[in-house]
Amino acid sequence: MRAEYQFVDRWFVPGARIEDVYDVIGEQLEYPKWWGDVFLAVTGDEGPPRPGRRASILSRGFLPYKLRWSSEIVEAQRPRGFRMTVSGDFVGGGEWTLEEVDGGGSATLDWRPVVEKPFVKQLTPVLRPLFRVNHVWAMRRGQEGIVEYMRRRGGEPQ
């Protein structure tokens, strides 16, 4: 059985311009600074999203296992969003879409991974709800982290 998942998560960053949110979300090498509960290590190409930019990632949720995966940007349109493919413990892809909303910036991740980590793949038929909660936990850490990071670096208007 394939361990296919589909998640759509939306973050709101109060007072932030989407250009600033895009720049933060787009620089994966910086994720451990503001999303460190989830992104333990990220190595790869520096700079903004662009086709061909790659990153190697070690991540985790609240469950006691880690995931090793790589991402490659396949399309980028600053500040509207970017699309990526992934391989490793995750296969598939995702797309970040950003938009201005009243009072700040909104970032939506449409994430469609197939999990290839053997034990997760084997246990998905029974533990899918728990793995979904693990994803929700990870995304909540990201939402909290980016809001605080943007506040600290002055991403809110004066």
Kindly give the residue locations of the regions a language model identified:
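Hydrophobic ligand-binding cavity/cleft-lining segments
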Residues: M1-R50, E156-Q158
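Solvent-exposed residues in well-ordered beta-strands and their adjoining turns
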Residues: F12-G15, L58-F62, E99-V101, R112-E116
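Amphipathic alpha-helical protein-protein interaction surfaces
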Residues: R17, E27-E30, R78, G103, ...
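Beta-strand/loop substructures that line and gate deep hydrophobic ligand-binding cavities in soluble
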Residues: T85-R140, P157
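Glycine-rich portal/gate segments that line the openings of hydrophobic small-molecule binding cavities
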Residues: V42-F90, S106, R140-Q158
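Hydrophobic/aromatic beta-strand elements that line small-molecule binding cavities or substrate pockets
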Residues: D9-W11, G44, W69-E75, G93-E100, ...
